[in-house]
Amino acid sequence: MSDFIFTSESVTEGHPDKICDQISDAVLDALLTEDPESRVACETVVNTGLCLLTGEITSKAKVDYIKLVRNVIKEIGYEGYKAGGFDANSCAVLVALDEQSPDISQGVNEADDVNDDLEDNTGAGDQGIMFGYACDETPELMPLPISLAHRLAIQLAKVRHENLLNYLLPDGKTQVSIDYEKGLPVSINTILISTQHNPEIDGLTNEEEIRQRIKEDLWKHVVIPATEDLEIKPNIIKTRFLVNPTGKFVVGGPQGDAGLTGRKIIVDTYGGYARHGGGAFSGKDPTKVDRSAAYAARYVAKSIVKAKLAKKAEVQLSYAIGVAKPISILVDTFDTGVISQANLTELIKKYFDLRPAAIIKEFDLRNLPQKMGGKFFRKTASYGHFGRRDLDLPWEKVEEKAAQLAEASKVFL
């Protein structure tokens, strides 16, 4: 199938599920900042007037969880007249956190394949499969649909925070459909933006008039700025532009829908363009391979594409709880590779150390929250963990590895 339309979505930081991801990662940041060896599996639930923290945590850090939760909600924008039934200052915050299971801790602390190599002594925190992906559709080596959906969501939140469109409220979603011909992106077929808003805008009360006003404002202040540097741009005549298709979006956030950590895993990764192992990221410390190994898989895939050894690459890793080395490594270049997939796998095993402790050390995952002033993982909890132009993410820095792969691959050419 070479001619098709592919669609991906993103959501803003005010989406109920994303509120939860940010709170869970804010907890992780706070704990790692004080105690880099913290073991964290923090889940968050939000509903009208309620936030619940649950999960398992083992740490020497002392954190005021209630204050932290309220601060995150406030920074997102749920406060005062914009709260919509979920006010940072008055919502109930319940904390129900246990310690990590000693059975899990034992497997992480001392791997099954223990030896004199320190990196072999830390086992994976769970079994599982993780995928990483990269392609040459964008400068950041991400699929265009998810990249553009994130751009729109980021810009939508920006104009709200800057009060450029003072009727906007925190909840929102974007969706982008891209036309592909011969497997390459050629045009933007459809842009959809659903954004929460005040019931009245500058004296307008008619539902259709309000929707038309929002549509005009979003094209000017969101769509155009978010796409101005792209080679493929939206066309006001040819690109279908949908805004709040139900007519209005006044009730939103946790008042409209309950939220839960880990329910936007496709938004967090590749927008459905590549496979996903099923494990969420937010609220998990780096010993959880759901997170750290997914970052490593992206690192490997991006290095391959950056080295021009393939136009697209998907890497699968698998782990067993308590075992340091990956059970399997699989790479697929979708018939775009310049060397065989077997040879690529050989290079991956030689140039990438994919044991959990080695990944943590390579990316400095335990210490980044402290180095970044207590906010690192939380920033990844909205608008994707990969291809972020606005964040300094270690798994996106592939120049050195790409150069190594490019040089080493010459023996196979």
Curated annotation (Swiss-Prot):
Single GO biological process annotation from the record: one-carbon metabolic process
Pathway terms, separated by semicolons: Amino-acid biosynthesis; S-adenosyl-L-methionine biosynthesis; S-adenosyl-L-methionine from L-methionine: step 1/1
The encoding gene: metK
Family according to the record: Belongs to the AdoMet synthase family.
Residue spans crossing the bilayer: none
Subunit details: Homotetramer; dimer of dimers.
Organism annotation: Prochlorococcus marinus (strain MIT 9215)
Any matching Pfam family: S-AdoMet_synt_M
Name under which the protein is recorded: S-adenosylmethionine synthase
Residues at which ATP binds: 15, 171-173, 248-249, 257, 263-264, 280, 284
EC assignment: 2.5.1.6
Annotated Mg(2+) binding sites: 17
